């Protein structure tokens, strides 16, 4: 990567990719981010150095949009302006965990463009000594910092667990997650750190457009394979108890990217929780879920479930249904699960899926503030929605009208002003820190 010669520029220098995937700068042009129909040149002041572990992606079948510093106009480039006839592609950042994007990489689709794979596509540019990302850090914990997950230690942990749990199918499944898919949650189990995943459910009662474990026929493939068996309660509890023994303030989470919804596997999860709690009161037992079955959730709370994280792309029913496409539950069931958890004194998070242009629309932020007043939660876990952003915005605009976005940073500030005790984060906290302010 060449260093930019324009060191005094307020704007980030635009970066593009060649057909071979080589990323380079375009002097004279500034990087642009987009949110809905809004196009914004990226500045140093509103971006961060590219977080460690972030991956850079180039976007096929698309033309980059950038800001011409000479004409002071937003332009769509169909070729390299310095090498006419040379094809160039937009570049996006798939940011590390804990960072949410404020703008999407700006581009225009070509005719008959293929849908983008299931990643988030943050805006990125170059300034002086490195790449910068249009993002905000919402969680500084190093739970999924790849620098703390050396492969030799992961392999050593796998060997130890093979000795400890030789015939445990769930342990075998997590080995595949760690080594085949590079899953940081699975790696943490074998490293004896933080949070252990407990994938259990083979089925789901939603058909999320951006489901990362099961996609129907089409051009998009799922990012990982859904678990193909239901672990026995004994397999679940044995693995969980190992993690509790190895980790101070351990977190155990049902509901992972490689499974359906855990509420549909309550027949094995309930006895597993009972078995864990019969042996120890240590460890935080958490469930990541769509919240579709409040009556089942209540039973799990009664036998030892400590916290719940409910996923939502929107608090507006039409927009929620447009993305989650629920099959056997209502939006009211999701809301009831949140209210139930608070009534029962449990720690409640919303897994709020972020896409600039929608999440920061006045309609969504107004609805979110109203929702939180009526249905309080303890934590918003901000996450980037892994989906083709233009396709997603088209889908959401079919469900509701959306005005000019106000910006993700302003969304965060507005909510914090309205609800000063509400926590922001990315990871499921242990019960020892449930009510510590950040």
Regions found by a protein language model. Name each.
Residues 1-165, 366-438:
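Auxiliary Fe-S-binding modules of radical SAM enzymes
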Residues 152-187, 212-239:
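Short, flexible helix-coil linker/hinge segments at the edges of structured domains or between repeats
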Residues 181-215, 250-254:
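N-terminal pre-triad scaffold of radical SAM enzymes
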Residues 195, 199, 216-272, 277-296, ...:
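Core AdoMet radical
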Residues 257-259, 290-292, 313-315, 353-355, ...:
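Active-site beta-loop-alpha junctions enriched in small/polar residues
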Residues 266-281, 332-346, 400-424:
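Alpha-helix-loop-beta-strand connector modules within alpha/beta enzyme cores
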Residues 295-302, 357-374:
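Catalytic cores of alpha/beta
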Residues 325-327, 337-364:
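Conserved strand-turn element in the central/C-terminal portion of the radical SAM core barrel
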